[in-house]
């Protein structure tokens, strides 16, 4: 239904990181995604080099009062699949978002993202619904561009300045650990070290 192409001032792996956790929703997406999702909870599974996260929608709150037979995963969650090395796939009820990040061959601090929004054909038969769904796809792509990637470009500038020697991923960021350890393993590098804390 829609396709957007963004040239972004951040490395493609940093772009993938933006899809790796949800606790930033209340700060970065306070007027957008935070209104639709609980940012402090998710389900996470790995499948070899790939992974799946289930982002918890606020609509799940209303399911508590329904029998389990009426629960619907696409009402309660948004599944997000990372397909190694550069694809984010987000299926919903009759829709699908596909985000692919491509490195810039000349400039490692830049990349191109292609954001596609697919919709089942029967949904598009109603012209009014088609326009609503089209707006949903456009809005989601703009959130990626204007919120996530804007922050990623800032992080890229910090990384290039040399002021920050390393980043620490928290225990609540399993997807980020998985992304980077998968990349490192494929490059023949040691896995990220785990920091020990006194109480563990």
Feature map (PLM): residue ranges:
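C-terminal catalytic domain of Rieske-type non-heme iron oxygenases
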Residues: 1-200
């Amino acid at each position: 239904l829609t396709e957007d192409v963004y040239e972004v001032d951040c490395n493609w792996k940093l772009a993938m990181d933006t899809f790796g956790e949800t606790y930033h929703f209340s700060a970065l997406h306070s007027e957008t995604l935070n209104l639709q999702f609980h940012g402090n909870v998710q389900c996470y599974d790995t499948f070899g080099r790939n992974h799946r996260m289930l982002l918890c929608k606020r609509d799940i709150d209303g399911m508590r009062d329904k029998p389990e037979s009426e629960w619907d995963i696409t009402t309660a969650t948004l599944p997000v699949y990372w397909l190694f090395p550069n694809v984010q796939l987000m299926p919903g009820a009759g829709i699908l978002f596909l985000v692919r990040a491509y490195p810039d061959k000349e400039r490692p601090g830049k990349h191109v993202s292609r954001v596609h929004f697919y919709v089942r054909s029967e949904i598009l038969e109603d012209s009014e619904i088609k326009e609503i769904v089209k707006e949903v796809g456009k809005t989601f792509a703009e959130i990626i561009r204007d919120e996530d990637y804007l922050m990623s470009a800032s992080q890229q500038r910090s990384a290039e300045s040399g002021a920050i020697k390393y980043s620490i991923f928290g225990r609540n960021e399993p997807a980020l650990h998985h992304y980077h350890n998968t990349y490192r393993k494929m490059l023949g590098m040691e896995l990220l070290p785990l920091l020990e804390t006194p109480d563990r």
